[in-house]
Regions:
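Residue-level signal for well-ordered alpha-helical scaffold segments within enzymatic catalytic domains
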Residues: 9-20, 89, 140, 305
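A surface/extracellular/periplasmic glyco- and lipid-processing/surface-interacting theme
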Residues: 11-51
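Extended HEAT/HEAT-like alpha-solenoid repeat tracts in very large eukaryotic scaffold/adaptor proteins
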Residues: 2-9, 13, 79-83
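Soluble non-cytosolic domains of exported or imported proteins
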Residues: 4-8, 24, 28, 74-77, ...
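Ser/Thr/Asn(+Pro)-rich, low-complexity disordered segments
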Residues: 37-84, 89-307
């Protein structure tokens, strides 16, 4: 059941390693793997097909489904962005014109550039995995596309997305926007976010709901827990990766929250329900939550090493 999520990770890694690290032999190896993946996708009508001959559930970039099937409305923009990036990266890595032709076909005949004008459907900051995918992919697409008209369209979609996401104070998202557009990208907030980031990457129990916080109750309308309108500083909240929710106040206190909820007469007491129930010092997060945005910004000249 390989999904589009996994393909995003592969192509982001292949492209950056190819451009920044690989020697000639490694470039040949990367090109061989990328060609196998893209040929499979194109040979199967823009799908990943498993060994049983059935397409996997989520690895779908079929333009007819994305453009015409309402069940794919939330993936339409995101998956359009993905496949255009895969193809452009594939052409850059392999030189195979088949991928450039497929890119132009999706732009010309299937209006995928139009799909990217507002590729993010705003969701009240509830679906963070796709946000991360989008910023990873747009950073590559803007690297490999030279056409000024296409770049302006893609930048329009990125700006629409970032205008919504900048409330999260996500340093990586801010840096991608700045690197790809040359516009002001809230550098000061991003630097503060990284400077405040805990050295201890263990997921400890956190309880912040007792505080006088600004609660956003809208998620409860779709059966989700309340969250904050504004994320807490990095050292006060759960350790976050780029694809996790920075608006959650608590972590690892399910039992305590349930006890308070059942004993309280306050109808809003359920705001104490935590985002997770298993953070008890048993998980260690990857250091890339810090190093990835930091070195991305250093590479693009957005920040400098402190003296």
């Amino acid at each position: 059941e390989t999904s589009s999520d996994e393909m995003v990770g592969h192509f982001y890694a292949y492209s950056n390693y190819f451009d920044l690290v690989a020697d000639d032999e490694e470039k040949k190896l990367i090109a061989s793997v990328v060609k196998k993946i893209l040929d499979h996708i194109l040979d199967n009508k823009f799908r990943l097909v498993d060994t049983d001959g059935v397409p996997t559930t989520w690895a779908n970039w079929d333009p007819d489904l994305l453009n015409n099937d309402h069940k794919w409305i939330y993936e339409k923009g995101t998956n359009s962005l993905q496949i255009l990036t895969f193809l452009k990266a594939g052409y850059h890595i392999t030189g195979d014109k088949r991928y450039e032709d497929a890119f132009e076909y999706l732009i010309r005949d299937k209006h995928f550039a139009m799909n990217l004008m507002q590729y993010k459907i705003l969701d009240g900051h509830l679906l963070h995995i796709d946000d991360n995918h989008d910023f990873l992919m747009i950073s590559l697409l803007m690297r490999y596309v030279d056409d000024p008209k296409l770049r302006s369209v893609f930048a329009m979609g990125l700006t629409h997305h970032w205008d919504d996401e900048k409330a999260e104070h996500n340093a990586f998202f801010n840096f991608v926007y700045g690197a790809c557009t040359g516009e002001q990208c809230d550098i000061e907030t991003s630097v503060d976010e990284l400077a405040d980031y805990p050295m201890d990457q263990i997921l400890w129990t956190l309880y912040n709901s007792w505080r006088d916080l600004d609660w956003d109750m809208r998620p409860t309308e779709v059966g989700m827990i309340p969250q904050l309108y504004h994320p807490l500083p990095a050292h006060e909240r759960r350790i976050n990766s780029c694809d996790s929710n920075r608006f959650i106040a608590d972590s690892g206190i399910a039992g305590e929250a349930e006890r308070l909820f059942t004993k309280s007469d306050d109808p809003t007491a359920f705001t104490m329900f935590p985002g997770t129930g298993d953070d008890h010092g048993m998980y260690l997060m990857a250091c890339t939550n810090y190093t990835h945005p930091y070195w991305f910004a250093r590479y693009y000249g957005l920040i400098e090493e402190a003296e």
